[in-house]
Amino acid sequence: MAISKEEVLEYIGSLSVLELSELVKMFEKKFGVSATPTVVAGAAVAGGAAAESEEKTEFNVILADSGAEKIKVIKVVREITGLGLKEAKDATEKTPHVLKEGVNKEEAETIKKKLEEVGAKVEVK
């Protein structure tokens, strides 16, 4: 005589929590499966986004304000970007201005340091 699915469900429904836990362990052992829940896809995506933001490898160097020593800032901008005198002057007057795009963190910090030494305000994003 075969047992129906409904009879199995009735039997499982009549078990105590302890008996049900033992039954689950028996299923895991017999069939080589695990009853542990899997990670929710939404949580994995959110975690991945956080990891990406921590591992940013390309940065933009933005001249926020050229400060009082505009001539010194123009010289540094020319050195960093290779722009001509007029283009470098325009870049320092029209702030905020992106000086370098897609540079690594070390280069971005070096550029920021050089510009801040001559009085400019710089952002690295």
From Swiss-Prot:
GO terms for molecular function: mRNA binding; structural constituent of ribosome. GO terms for biological process: translation. InterPro entries: Ribosomal_bL12, Ribosomal_bL12_C, Ribosomal_bL12_C/ClpS-like, Ribosomal_bL12_oligo, Ribosomal_bL12_oligo_N_sf. CDD domains: Ribosomal_L7_L12 (cd00387). Coiled coil: none annotated. It holds the Pfam family Ribosomal_L12_N. Keywords: Ribonucleoprotein, Ribosomal protein. GO terms for cellular component: cytosolic large ribosomal subunit. Belongs to the bacterial ribosomal protein bL12 family. Forms part of the ribosomal stalk which helps the ribosome interact with GTP-bound translation factors. Is thus essential for accurate translation. Homodimer. Part of the ribosomal stalk of the 50S ribosomal subunit. Forms a multimeric L10(L12)X complex, where L10 forms an elongated spine to which 2 to 4 L12 dimers bind in a sequential fashion. Binds GTP-bound translation factors. This is Large ribosomal subunit protein bL12.
